[in-house]
């Protein structure tokens, strides 16, 4: 059996200790983001109606769409002392979304239905979702105001006219429903909202063809469509007379 001389033995012990320290460091780095995912709590209807000050659960923050945060740590007396904590390169394209935040995780909906989840404290990536691209006829279809957190889901409305539910801790699709036809220009530009367990969305892109758009409600757990209403009434429908003698095929508009 070979015997290490004292120098080699000390070198071996030193390398082993360094390797162990490196492994512990890597394990700790991996454990931190995993702990965020493990500790994620489902978003309730009560939280959607009255979000915690530290959270931003939908595009405009609250159901009334005020886009106002009650946080007061940053004010006119200290705003000039703000410094960059971390930065993140977004997907190229038109950006009209706002980051969503819950339990220390920041969700970044971006152009053309690309979603990333990161550690809000330092930007460490947690997962990403990239929807297949389509050759859309609507030039603004990649620009949307997307995303609502509910239960353990991130619910988005896409440029190819689908509503999609992603698992908030993995980015995996839990359900998706086709609502319109992207090949004729229909798409979602506004994000979904959740009320009483229903996902409410309004279709866009109907100005490209002779038809009106609509608003739909879907079961948040399954995506099943529960009701649909046209935003432009047809002849014989309630308020249809408000369009006078305009035929149905010329009654069109967005939602």
Indicate where each model-derived feature is located.
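Conserved beta-propeller blade signature
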Residues: 105-109, 116, 154-156, 200
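Short glycine/acidic-enriched loop and turn motifs that connect beta-strands
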Residues: 63-65, 114, 162, 206-209
